[in-house]
């Protein structure tokens, strides 16, 4: 089986994690795909567990792995490092799964440069910036300053959406999930 690397990007609050979670619960999702766990230096949120959502590491640990050329992609986002290690991709490729990377546009560029046609990409858009702000506020996990910063970053991220193979506007979750699943089903057969 030829393993593909699927890049999934979106601004915070667009519904990327919710769509991925629902997709991975489907038969095609759970049988054929695995999400690469990224490293991060940010603090865990309530309910997050090390090596499930992220590998939570210190800045020193991240920078040491970085100095050893241990990442296929990395970026500093919201004052924290995020990166996907080569060891994590090797682990998932050995399982024979297609890999899903939840990464930003910078990581997507780095990954496409390495993997070329083996890397496929989808960008999830909110229906509007106003709706995105409402979703971020509804989460009730970030301060107003953090939400304002995320909104600034969202505009930057959205400006790179045209670099992706497929764009999905997440307005109605059920319809978006159906389109999301179809994208993965079609690309696993290509």
UniProtKB/Swiss-Prot annotation:
Residues 3-185 form the Guanylate kinase-like domain. Signal peptide: none annotated. GO terms for cellular component: cytosol. Its main location: cytoplasm. ATP binds at residues 10-17. PROSITE patterns: GUANYLATE_KINASE_2 (PS50052). It catalyses: GMP + ATP = GDP + ADP. Its EC number is 2.7.4.8. It is found in: Cytoplasm. GO terms for molecular function: ATP binding; guanylate kinase activity. Keywords: ATP-binding, Cytoplasm, Kinase, Nucleotide-binding, Transferase. InterPro entries: GK/Ca_channel_bsu (IPR008145), Guanylate_kin-like_dom (IPR008144), Guanylate_kinase (IPR017665), P-loop_NTPase (IPR027417). It comes from the Bacteria. Belongs to the guanylate kinase family. Essential for recycling GMP and indirectly, cGMP. This is Guanylate kinase. It comes from Francisella tularensis subsp. tularensis (strain SCHU S4 / Schu 4). The gene is gmk.
């Amino acid at each position: 089986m030829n393993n593909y690397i699927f890049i999934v990007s979106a601004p915070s609050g667009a519904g990327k994690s919710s769509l991925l979670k629902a997709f991975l619960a489907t038969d095609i999702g759970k049988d054929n795909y695995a999400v690469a766990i990224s490293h991060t230096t940010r603090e865990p949120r309530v309910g997050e567990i090390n090596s499930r959502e992220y590998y939570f590491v210190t800045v020193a640990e991240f920078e040491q792995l970085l100095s050893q050329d241990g990442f296929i992609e990395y970026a500093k986002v919201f004052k924290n490092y995020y990166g996907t290690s080569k060891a994590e991709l090797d682990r998932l490729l050995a399982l024979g799964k297609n890999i899903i990377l939840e990464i930003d546009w910078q990581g997507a560029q780095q990954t496409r440069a390495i993997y070329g046609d083996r890397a496929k990409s989808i960008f999830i858009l909110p229906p509007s910036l106003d709706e995105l702000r409402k979703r971020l506020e509804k989460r009730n996990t970030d301060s107003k300053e953090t939400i304002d910063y995320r909104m600034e970053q969202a505009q930057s991220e959205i400006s790179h959406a045209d670099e992706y193979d497929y764009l999905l506007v997440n307005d109605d979750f059920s319809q978006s999930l159906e389109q999301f699943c179809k994208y993965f089903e079609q690309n696993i057969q290509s």
